[in-house]
Structures are given as C-alpha cells and as structure tokens.
Amino acid sequence: MVTFQILTPKDIKRIVPLILELNPELDKQTIESNQKEMFGIANYRCFGLFKEDHLIGVSSGWITVRHYCGKQIEIDNVIIPLAYQSRGYGKQLIELIEQWS
C-alpha cells in the first residue's frame, strides 16, 4: 500500500537521493540548498509517495492563478526511482496531487 503526503523542509534528506537520480551531476549540498530555498517560497509545494515508510516518488509544483482558469497547480517534476518505475506509481502520484488540488 502507498501513502501520499505533503513534504516539508524536514524531509529534505529523504528527497535528495531521488533528485540525485534525476540529476546525478548535482551535488548533495546544492540540492539541499535549492530545496531549502524552494520550500521558502509561499506558492511552492512538494509531494511524496511512500511505500511503507520508504519515499518512492516525489513531485513538486507551484500554485498559480491564471485569468483563463483561476487557481491551479503547475507540476514541475515527477521523480520515481528506476527500481519503482513502470509500476504505475508516477500515475498514482499525479492522481493524488490532482485529488489534493
């Protein structure tokens, strides 16, 4: 069973390995610094998908308001580690974000 939660700055250490998988050329300190800065932006949200207590997916997004559609969330990244890909977890994470929004 998987669970969904909004991630906070307390989760940065758990998020870093997934971002490293997406961007292996970055170093941990840069990722941590960038992530801390993003968490400080009021319209930023970060979402996690957990299998038991293990973070198996992360996505982030920006809450915006558009003249043509009103309030929305613009998803920035969806990261599912290679070991969990092709099992529907990415789709499930997007669906859970849609339900949250």
State what each model feature region is.
Residues G48, H54-T64, I79:
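Conserved beta-strand in the GNAT
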Residues R14-L18, S33, H54, Q92, ...:
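Alpha-helical elements of Rossmann-like donor-binding domains used by nucleotide-donor carbohydrate transfer enzymes
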Residues V2, D53-V58, I73:
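Glycine-rich phosphate/pyrophosphate-binding loop shared by adenosine-nucleotide-utilizing enzymes
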